[in-house]
Curated annotation (Swiss-Prot):
Gene3D superfamilies: Insulin-like (1.10.100.10). InterPro entries: Insulin, Insulin-like, Insulin-like_sf, Insulin_CS, Insulin_family. This is Insulin. Keywords: Carbohydrate metabolism, Disulfide bond, Glucose metabolism, Hormone, Secreted. The lineage of its organism: Eukaryota, Metazoa, Chordata, Craniata, Vertebrata. Its main location: secreted. Belongs to the insulin family. Insulin decreases blood glucose concentration. It increases cell permeability to monosaccharides, amino acids and fatty acids. It accelerates glycolysis, the pentose phosphate cycle, and glycogen synthesis in liver. SUPFAM superfamilies: Insulin-like. GO terms for biological process: glucose metabolic process. GO terms for cellular component: extracellular space. Disulfide bonds join C7-C37, C19-C50, C36-C41. One of its GO terms (molecular function) is hormone activity.
Amino acid sequence: APNQRLCGSHLVEALFLICGERGFYYSPRSGIVEQCCENTCSLYQLENYCN
């Protein structure tokens, strides 16, 4: 899949889909907003935020 720009609820929904039952760590301080909203990120990068 190509890199995507994901912000706000779209970003949270993507994490729910990717991480599933593992859950995820969503904190603006983790850099996920800079990585995935201000820039673009891959599904592989999103998976780094799963628990």
